[in-house]
């Protein structure tokens, strides 16, 4: 009887290791506020990772497509029930995360005899004014964080930290959609390269004959190098972008950027990888 709490703690630790492993091949997600609203960007393998949730709410995700789809439908249902029973203005990202989806993810994670959700989620909320914009991220254990300006999902905490630091350092006072897309893709490349570097460092540490292993403090690559990395990866994938547009007509502010939009907005080095 006295061993049960320790077994539970050990089981939770094992679940963390298992879940961390599942995200190693995941594609980062970047959310960034720009002059006209909020931009979400990722590079997907075919299954969409960006969705509309409600009039002023968007979702980005990493993880197992089935789990992501299940939670997306849960968010959709919660948002529309809330909007019907109360009012559309009461449907906020904060309420949906804090009182809706985060407790569900937390419960699944802590029930060690059931499968957890293999997901990391980003919820973007477009405010009536720019200062009211909100970005929320939820980890696979149900913990969440609310930020402004930018937010990311990444394979590892190290990659996430590097992406966030890069965005905060590179974001100017004013940012057009075209500039925001360029910056988001560079931040995506930072996350992708950071994870590759972590794996390289781990392999080097496992080979004691090699010296000079570990380069986690390496300088940030130039913009050209970052874009070349995106170009190399995106050739077999899809650059996926969506915006919450403050001045869009109607109640729904969500719009997925089509290939024609991307061909106009992407840097010249990447325009050839957009497939209509």
Language model segments and positions:
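Long, low-complexity N-terminal extensions
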Residues: 1-276
């Amino acid at each position: 009887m006295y061993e049960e709490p320790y077994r539970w703690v050990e089981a939770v630790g094992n679940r963390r290791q298992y879940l961390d492993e599942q995200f190693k091949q995941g594609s980062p997600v970047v959310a960034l506020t720009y002059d006209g609203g909020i931009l979400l960007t990722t590079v997907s393998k075919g299954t969409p990772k960006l969705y509309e949730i409600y009039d002023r709410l968007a979702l980005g995700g990493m993880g197992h497509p089935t789990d992501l789809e299940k939670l997306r439908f849960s968010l959709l249902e919660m948002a529309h029930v809330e909007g019907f029973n109360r009012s559309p203005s009461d449907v906020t990202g904060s309420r949906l995360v804090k009182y809706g989806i985060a407790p569900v993810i937390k419960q699944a994670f802590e029930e060690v005899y059931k499968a957890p959700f293999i997901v990391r989620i980003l919820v973007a909320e477009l405010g009536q004014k720019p200062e009211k914009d909100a970005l929320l991220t939820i980890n696979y254990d149900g913990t969440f964080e609310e930020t402004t300006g930018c937010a990311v999902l990444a394979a590892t905490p190290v990659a996430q930290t590097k992406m966030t630091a890069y965005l905060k350092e590179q974001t100017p006072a004013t940012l057009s959609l075209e500039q925001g897309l360029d910056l988001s893709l560079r931040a995506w490349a930072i996350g992708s390269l950071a994870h590759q570097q972590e794996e390289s460092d781990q392999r080097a540490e496992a080979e004691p004959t090699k010296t000079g292993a570990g380069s986690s403090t390496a300088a940030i690559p130039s913009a050209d190098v970052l874009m070349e990395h995106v170009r190399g990866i995106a050739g077999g994938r899809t650059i996926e972008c969506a915006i919450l547009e403050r001045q869009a007509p109607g109640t729904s502010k969500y719009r997925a950027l089509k290939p024609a939009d991307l061909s106009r907005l992407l840097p010249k080095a990447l325009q050839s990888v957009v497939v209509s």
